[in-house]
């Protein structure tokens, strides 16, 4: 699915004031980036940006080198040679605003991915500039590494580290019949890693960066299925000061866009959280965000899944059949709770991505062992039966009571249970650290006493 511009929203890129702000102050040491880029920076300590009205504003970059564009500048002939003149055999696929090729740099022998932007694209140049700047300033293990770029004449190319396992979309929706589907543990690991990349953009960059095109095809996989976010051409700087959103022309991918952004053009970090929820649902269900080949009523993933969230007896139906039942039922419920909270229609009710990272890190650490499947499945089924009895007025309502008093509260109740488990895990970890610290202090004290006695 490609990018689209929907509705006839204003092209204004200014920040609109509103009454409240959900974003705290960022530390001065955080990476600083500039918006509305008109050209690549020359390496100075300031980046200038121009608003539609023509007025300039300057964003100071840290003096620790973040302001320097570290990416290497390539000549077009170097990249043509690396890709055998963009031979069809080196073609990897379509990326945002261009085609991606596999290449090998003659100078270093490094295998790379080369994205050649569409020279006829109306926005290709802006997206090129944004991506070069973003990936040059922002570095994180879950963001793809930009090696360099080419801006010879009208040529616009980006050179990335090569991600050998392709995209998450490949493994979820384009998997050959002879290939094994991602297992439950790997899906949770990928979700947690992708969320960490998004958290870095939202909470560590200053001002925050809104990704704006979070989707399964933009999550690339390295060796070991380590996920990295790619394609930053649509990224926008988030609101600053007392602003709570950015007003911009609606861009993104159908099926992933948050409803408030699609309708009003008002963009916040919670817009990314919605998109993350859609991708997380793809991981859980194995379904596409939009699939025209599915029966009527099941073509839109979110619209299909939402009613199922209100009936715990149907939770199992949300699991990807290719998992073949090899997943912990309780973890499935918890994962669905996270997804449900992320795709809430009201942006204010969605969690912050930092909270999502906490929840998914917990789930990713609860490794599922297929060899223990039978006993665990029996325990989960007993818990499910307790829930059923509770519906009829009996039973104890155990920790598998995911819904509480009303069905519509089930995602919230599950989130509460998940938070309780996370808090318990934190408490145990803190207790261990405290115990280790206390033992170390005692050891040092005893050692000091022993040395004192020996000298006496």
UniProtKB/Swiss-Prot annotation:
<comment type="function">
    <text>Protein kinase required for plant defense mechanism mediated by the disease resistance (R) protein RPS5. In case of infection by Pseudomonas syringae, AvrPphB triggers RPS5-mediated defense mechanism via the cleavage of PBS1. Both kinase activity and cleavage by avrPphB are independently required to trigger the RPS5-mediated resistance. Contributes to PAMP-triggered immunity (PTI) signaling and defense responses downstream of FLS2.</text>
</comment>
<dbReference type="GO" id="GO:0106310">
    <property type="term" value="F:protein serine kinase activity"/>
</dbReference>
<protein>
    <recommendedName>
        <fullName>Serine/threonine-protein kinase PBS1</fullName>
        <ecNumber>2.7.11.1</ecNumber>
    </recommendedName>
</protein>
<dbReference type="GO" id="GO:0005886">
    <property type="term" value="C:plasma membrane"/>
</dbReference>
<feature type="compositionally biased region" description="Polar residues">
    <location>
        <begin position="27"/>
        <end position="39"/>
    </location>
</feature>
<feature type="modified residue" description="Phosphothreonine">
    <location>
        <position position="248"/>
    </location>
</feature>
<feature type="modified residue" description="Phosphoserine">
    <location>
        <position position="21"/>
    </location>
</feature>
<feature type="short sequence motif" description="Recognition motif required for RPS5-mediated plant resistance to P.syringae">
    <location>
        <begin position="292"/>
        <end position="296"/>
    </location>
</feature>
<keyword id="KW-0564">Palmitate</keyword>
<feature type="modified residue" description="Phosphoserine">
    <location>
        <position position="217"/>
    </location>
</feature>
<keyword id="KW-0449">Lipoprotein</keyword>
<feature type="domain" description="Protein kinase">
    <location>
        <begin position="86"/>
        <end position="363"/>
    </location>
</feature>
<dbReference type="InterPro" id="IPR017441">
    <property type="entry name" value="Protein_kinase_ATP_BS"/>
</dbReference>
<feature type="compositionally biased region" description="Basic and acidic residues">
    <location>
        <begin position="370"/>
        <end position="392"/>
    </location>
</feature>
<comment type="subunit">
    <text>In infected plant cells, it interacts with the P.syringae virulence protein avrPphB. In uninfected plants, autophosphorylated form interacts with RPS5. Interacts with FLS2.</text>
</comment>
<keyword id="KW-0723">Serine/threonine-protein kinase</keyword>
<feature type="modified residue" description="Phosphotyrosine">
    <location>
        <position position="160"/>
    </location>
</feature>
<feature type="binding site">
    <location>
        <position position="115"/>
    </location>
    <ligand>
        <name>ATP</name>
    </ligand>
</feature>
<keyword id="KW-0547">Nucleotide-binding</keyword>
<feature type="binding site">
    <location>
        <begin position="92"/>
        <end position="100"/>
    </location>
    <ligand>
        <name>ATP</name>
    </ligand>
</feature>
<dbReference type="GO" id="GO:0004672">
    <property type="term" value="F:protein kinase activity"/>
</dbReference>
<keyword id="KW-1003">Cell membrane</keyword>
<dbReference type="InterPro" id="IPR008271">
    <property type="entry name" value="Ser/Thr_kinase_AS"/>
</dbReference>
<feature type="lipid moiety-binding region" description="N-myristoyl glycine">
    <location>
        <position position="2"/>
    </location>
</feature>
<dbReference type="GO" id="GO:0002221">
    <property type="term" value="P:pattern recognition receptor signaling pathway"/>
</dbReference>
<feature type="lipid moiety-binding region" description="S-palmitoyl cysteine">
    <location>
        <position position="3"/>
    </location>
</feature>
<keyword id="KW-0418">Kinase</keyword>
<feature type="modified residue" description="Phosphothreonine">
    <location>
        <position position="253"/>
    </location>
</feature>
<dbReference type="GO" id="GO:0004674">
    <property type="term" value="F:protein serine/threonine kinase activity"/>
</dbReference>
<feature type="region of interest" description="Disordered">
    <location>
        <begin position="1"/>
        <end position="57"/>
    </location>
</feature>
<feature type="compositionally biased region" description="Polar residues">
    <location>
        <begin position="446"/>
        <end position="456"/>
    </location>
</feature>
<keyword id="KW-0611">Plant defense</keyword>
<feature type="modified residue" description="Phosphotyrosine">
    <location>
        <position position="261"/>
    </location>
</feature>
<feature type="lipid moiety-binding region" description="S-palmitoyl cysteine">
    <location>
        <position position="6"/>
    </location>
</feature>
<dbReference type="GO" id="GO:0042742">
    <property type="term" value="P:defense response to bacterium"/>
</dbReference>
<feature type="compositionally biased region" description="Basic and acidic residues">
    <location>
        <begin position="12"/>
        <end position="23"/>
    </location>
</feature>
<dbReference type="InterPro" id="IPR000719">
    <property type="entry name" value="Prot_kinase_dom"/>
</dbReference>
<feature type="modified residue" description="Phosphoserine">
    <location>
        <position position="247"/>
    </location>
</feature>
<feature type="active site" description="Proton acceptor">
    <location>
        <position position="213"/>
    </location>
</feature>
<dbReference type="GO" id="GO:0046777">
    <property type="term" value="P:protein autophosphorylation"/>
</dbReference>
<dbReference type="Pfam" id="PF00069">
    <property type="entry name" value="Pkinase"/>
</dbReference>
<dbReference type="InterPro" id="IPR011009">
    <property type="entry name" value="Kinase-like_dom_sf"/>
</dbReference>
């Amino acid at each position: 699915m490609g990018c689209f511009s929907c509705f006839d929203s204003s092209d204004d890129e200014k920040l609109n004031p509103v009454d409240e702000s959900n974003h705290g102050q960022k530390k001065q040491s955080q990476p600083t980036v500039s918006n509305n880029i008109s050209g690549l920076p020359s390496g100075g300590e300031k980046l200038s940006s121009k608003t539609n009205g023509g007025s300039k504003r300057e964003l100071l970059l840290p003096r620790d080198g973040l302001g320097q564009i570290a990416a290497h500048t390539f000549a077009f002939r170097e990249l043509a040679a690396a890709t055998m003149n963009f031979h069809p055999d080196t073609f990897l696929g379509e990326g945002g605003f261009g085609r991606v090729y596999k290449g090998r740099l003659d100078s270093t022998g490094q295998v790379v991915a080369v994205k050649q932007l569409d020279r006829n694209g109306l926005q290709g140049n802006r997206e090129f500039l944004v991506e070069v700047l973003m990936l040059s300033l922002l570095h994180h293990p879950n963001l793809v590494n930009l090696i360099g770029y080419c801006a010879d004449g009208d040529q616009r190319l980006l050179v990335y580290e090569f991600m050998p396992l392709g995209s998450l979309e490949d493994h979820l929706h384009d998997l050959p019949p002879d290939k094994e589907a991602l297992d439950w543990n790997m899906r949770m690991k990928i979700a947690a890693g992708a969320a960490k990349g998004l958290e870095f953009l939202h909470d560590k960059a200053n001002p925050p960066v809104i990704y704006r095109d979070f989707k399964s095809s933009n999550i690339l996989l390295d060796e070991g299925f380590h996920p990295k976010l790619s394609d930053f051409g649509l990224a926008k700087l988030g609101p600053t000061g007392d602003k709570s959103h950015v007003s911009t022309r609606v861009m993104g991918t159908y099926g992933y866009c948050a409803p408030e952004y699609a309708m009003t053009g008002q963009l916040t970090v919670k817009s990314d959280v919605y998109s993350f929820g859609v991708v997380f649902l793809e991981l859980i269900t194995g379904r596409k965000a939009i699939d025209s080949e599915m029966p009527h009523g099941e073509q839109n993933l979110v619209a299909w899944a939402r009613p199922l969230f209100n009936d715990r007896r149907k939770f199992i139906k949300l699991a990807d059949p290719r998992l073949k039942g090899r997943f912990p039922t309780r973890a499935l419920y918890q994962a669905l709770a996270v997804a449900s909270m992320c795709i809430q229609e009201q942006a204010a009710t969605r969690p912050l991505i930092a909270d999502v990272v906490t929840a998914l890190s917990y789930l990713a650490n609860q490794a599922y062992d297929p060899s223990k499947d039978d006993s665990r499945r029996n325990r989960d089924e007993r818990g499910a039966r307790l829930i059923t009895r509770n519906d009829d007025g009996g039973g104890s309502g155990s920790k598998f009571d995911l819904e509480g008093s009303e069905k519509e509260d089930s995602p919230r109740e599950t989130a509460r249970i998940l938070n309780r488990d996370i808090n318990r895990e934190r408490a145990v970890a803190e207790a261990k650290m405290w115990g280790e610290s206390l033992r170390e202090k005692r050891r040092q004290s005893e050692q000091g006493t022993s040395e004192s006695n020996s000298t006496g």
